[in-house]
């Protein structure tokens, strides 16, 4: 115990002077009790900063046993030193060692609970039934009746009544029972064995785990000892006080967040009151919050303790008499009683010199919340001298230490650079903004540890300062320390001599300056310098910089003191930062003003002549306090930044003047006053320090006077003498106190009697406490002047005064509740009547405004108007409770939770506002970022949440977690949900097509390349992390690592590569322009009819173009696959959670037809194959089915090495679903977009399939067959990468099926050429791994392409294949200077693949064509054997002649050429080009080429000999190699002795009428279904684990003819588009006609494309609206029929558009129709109120809004919400003018403003939130034809005056003005920053919004467009134009 007591003493006295909690003995008693009763080592205990409870560091096992009601000794933290444990107990420290956690122990002393406690309301349970208005009114009436009766009885009846007092329980029993009911567990006896009364008296208690309210901070355990009651809580990391103090931006601009906090607090208080428990004197510290602002209430049980009279007396004596211990253990001294005073008293005491500088600064640190020993938030004091000279030179306290250290130039540079970055970043970028600032921190944790390095363990220093231990790099002297640091000083350098003494053997002690003989002397001298006159006079400037008004605003910028923490508006929670205490200039210390000195200054009657002054110095040792620093200042040149850059003070001038006066020789006075100079110079100086005496060292010499000038007798005041100085200083102090501290006079207390404590009065006190707490939250910056432990009545009076004086600062939503709780208004405002610990502050009136005194239940009632809680709060609260209650440990529970939340989400979103979404969104994002819930949350919740957010916010907040879910390295069960076509359709609709293609599609496609590729591909595709070989890496890709967000409670998690924001940084829409404020017509973001669940699944219909998995197209694909021999396909997808059941088929006949034409031909593929001479395969399996080719069982066996952690079945389902989705998406996007985005990404992915040595291993079977001898030469010999690349190749070839052969020749082949092209540098170098993989991918893809090329096409591009593909590949393969990263293995694989490719081409084109076109590649390949043979056999010497450093030696070969040779690569080449390789290539090529081999290959004899040698080594008894060719011709077993596969397997070899069988060429018989050659080919699978996919052995296959095949204009346009850079921001119009859409019988009045760009709408004079598909057909001359016709209009339709959120169509013919584009059903019709006043213009609000704005002919603007009946708003636009009819309306992209254009050319801008007209101006001289609004508050208008004008919303002059020469621009659309215009003269123009006015105009030819142009719409992603004409035909042009 002695050791424990000593340790505890260290903890208790760790605070500096004035630093310990208010009730030291009480807290010390609590510490002792916890140590004794809970068996926790004293080292592991510490007091909480407020002194209200004890924080304990305990092991998680001990805590788990405590939860199970077993209490044993808590293990000690053996591996941690005392300093480390002390650091771990600090609030700002969040990372704890594994196996350890922190808890809070709250204690109640039983002896203080001995008073009786009167019963209030009986214990009652909350009702489960919803509250009704009738019930609410009944309860109010009954309570009013009871209260009025009781009030009357106490007033009139009780004085005359002699009835006995009602019985009351002892407070101890009442509290014990209430705690058990509230926390749902019983007390566990601890300490000495005692009879636990709770089990006897309390009756049944709830079972463990059922607390009364989830909004209460849960209790880990309730413990009872003979003397104490304990409540053990989990540690609270952040409180509401931290939010309002350090992260106020988290609550800024959102009243809903504050109200939701209040809502949860009231829920908790209501639960406590129902159980008979008061909450105590709550403060902001008692409300625990997390990053999601989910609050939990921590009760203040100490309020129940009633101190006895003796303790009261002791407490007062202690408070008034004793001080607080100093940090030094042995030194205990008293301090003045102002430690507990409010800030006003502290300021006055310091100003008047009654307390020291040190004590005052420590109190300011305490008020700012700084905590002793906290490395992140330790107290700070100023450095005052620089230690360079004896007693140092004083620093300039007008500048921060950071500024003095860094210099003004660097700070200006930092501020300017961050300011420019902030301006450049703007609101549109996703990256965290760069905020202009000068200073990052006042005292960083690194500086703190460097300061205390001598006393801090080495492990801690290595963890925080520098990982490598370098003791000599730490500053060795105080002078070096002070010079090095940019941060301020710490109190230890003023108080603790031990800080200089090192505990490390290899680190010397910190040296004190040479002018001090010991550490103790330095500390005393340093402290004296802090208290010196020079420091005191300027200390107020330092306070202004560190705690005062110079921290923010213009003053901060002027003083270069803008602190990052105060201006970055961070929303992550933190428990430390920079706190501003004062917003007014701090008064200066009054150090004996000469104006009010005890003696008046001598005023001479003679004019003073110029005086020469001489100063001297004397020894000043021992007189530092009396102004020694001042003498040092005079003796030392003031040249550095440490000197003051201001003129001498009035004190200096006064001294000089008085010394001169003393030396003046007056008649009879000369020399009479030798000491007057010193006595007058310092009257009252340093009144707080040692007794002042005469200032030493001052000697003055008098100057002579001219006697003739002394007779006038003028009165001369001393220079600097100001008689009103005292008045000015008094006024400054008064202003500071009034404005900065808001102090007021105190009224004397009146004695009052102490009535008995009643529970009801405690409940009333709780409500008053709640009012105080709310007011403190509102006035957080103004109540910092209160002491942290101020009593409740002090807090109440402070906030009550603030509420009355600053009522306008109170948010409107909180004004009624504050008025009710604190009784601010009324006939007489309450004053504090009782100041007892258990007394209410004042008595509530029995009935106020018809309601009883406030209670939590009353405030929570929806029928009470006291707090305007939004209607969605209960549903939101229920949603959050469900989220918190469910513990998810596996995917099954994750799915159940996501489904349960989805069921409740509809009720939440029905009435939610943008502010409510800010509260909800972090919970959804958290679910989407956690491993077990990510997939199911995305599946269930993405659609409704993204619908409510709108596209802009959905991209901002949901994109990152979606990327994380797609990139997760773990095999998540059900992951295939994310790859279903219906889910991807939702992504396209809710994120926007362009955003989906740019940001998400690359991540979606990565699954096709396997799990490992999704990480490797990050390098080449989306820039994520490096590849990892492990199947389950510790952390996922950089964009989102599961669990990362929840492991660390502190700093925000790192952003992804896209710079997307993390939800931990807070969700706030206020800085955007896409979500409105909470006005009525935009307050809710409604969801359309909630889809009904199908088999417990969320069904969400995407949009019209979604092709369902159960559509005929998909079924046709499946049929094709099944017929082709993959029976497992359907069953595998159907197993488990099949997407077949999740989406209803909504595709119409045309959709099915357009896909069906492809499917039909795929289904007929068997017949085509059978009758073709040119194809060997009888099915198209891998290309037509999503499943990987072959039967499912074999495929799974092949993939097992890749997916050791998963079942092959899940992987198969995943790939199946993903491939189907890619096929669907490729058809949906159209040829140009599919090629630009899908095909390009797939081509990049193909390379990733071969990266790494693992992917380059041949697949082998159980026998040891060498892979080189397996099968025919042109057959595929798969490596692992071939298996992985199967789905990628399948999807690539499907795009070729859709759009035809040009995809192969114009897109794939150029990319292959790019992959194999040699590097730009001339010097040969080693390949990188990605280039190596690219070569393998290129050869593999080329082999696939060759099979599908027609004969004509193949011969046309054969020269390109030879020169751009084969020769570059052979150049790498046969190079003597280029090495492969994977060595011989990669070169061998490339060699085998290249042989197969060349052989395939040879078989396709025949011998003659080989000689004509392929002789060079074949010869080049064979030549390498000769070169190697010469180097090996003849030992050809390498010629070093002429080789300079860095050059390779060269060798001369038999052909006479000299070639460089890298000697280090010879071994690699010899491993590749072996005898076996020679045999493998020579035999088939000799058969393929016959006699031509002698002409093509000069060294064929050498290669033949090498092949013979290999044959001899394999079978020595074989025949002579010379007879090899006849041998090959006759038999064929020699081809592969092990496998038995013979060369006759070659089958049909040529495509020019000849077929090779063995080495004989013959014309084959037609054998459509003959299994002969196919059967032998299939046997290859037994030789090397090869795939038995028949199509891999095909020489030629026909591409099915698709309805979407490119030809004519479509082909020309597609060829152009794939060559255009994706970064090209300009719109190019080439007038290429792509499609026609006839159908309307009248002129087309309006055209509008849907956001997904696969359908568009048109309205016509024929009173119909038509829906058209946008899929490509034919050659540009095809005509497409409409998909749906809406014919409910009665007049000409002049407007059509789409409401994005609900996906409804809005059309107008004078009345507005809202209808469903899926069914054509009318949902709503809005007719004009007066038929004579029709609607003339319509516009829809952008997502997420569902409002429609309409203008009528009477210049009235009306808003309609399609979800609600009736009108929302009605605004008049005319304003008394007669501007004419409204011709056009446009809504800003944010939805915050709408602009109307009139027929008179007038334009009006209206704020949609307030209805106020922001601006009205005459914009044009003629009729306004069209208006559009763009991001950045830009408006574009066109008029009949031939002009197109670009405006800024609130600027008077236009930014650009375009004038059309001949015709007005009557229609236009936007493409990025360009405007595409159309005129009635059929001219299309393109002009820029950014550049000076210039316009490119194109006249539409009559061949491409007939009629007159009436309307125009642009497809921005596809870059197409839809043009409507007056003849009813719409044309698609590009």
Curated annotation (Swiss-Prot):
Bias (Low complexity) ranges: 673-695, 1566-1580
Comp. bias (Acidic residues): 1147-1168
PROSITE patterns: BEACH, WD_REPEATS_2, WD_REPEATS_REGION
Protein's name according to its UniProt entry: WD repeat-containing protein 81
Tissues expressed in: Expressed in brain, Purkinje cells of cerebellum, retinal photoreceptor cells and spinal cord (at protein level). In brain, specifically expressed by neuronal cells (at protein level). Detected in a wide range of tissues including intestine, adipose tissue, liver, pancreas, thymus, spleen, kidney, heart, eye, sciatic nerve, and testis.
Disruption phenotype: Brain-specific, conditional knockout mice are born at the expected Mendelian frequency, but most of them die a few hours after birth. If they show no overt brain morphological abnormalities, a neuronal accumulation of SQSTM1 in foci is observed.
Biased segments, Basic and acidic residues type: 316-334, 1589-1599
This protein's encoding gene: Wdr81
Cell compartment(s), UniProt: Early endosome membrane; Late endosome membrane; Lysosome membrane; Cytoplasmic vesicle, Autophagosome membrane
Job of this protein: Functions as a negative regulator of the PI3 kinase/PI3K activity associated with endosomal membranes via BECN1, a core subunit of the PI3K complex. By modifying the phosphatidylinositol 3-phosphate/PtdInsP3 content of endosomal membranes may regulate endosome fusion, recycling, sorting and early to late endosome transport. It is for instance, required for the delivery of cargos like BST2/tetherin from early to late endosome and thereby participates indirectly to their degradation by the lysosome.
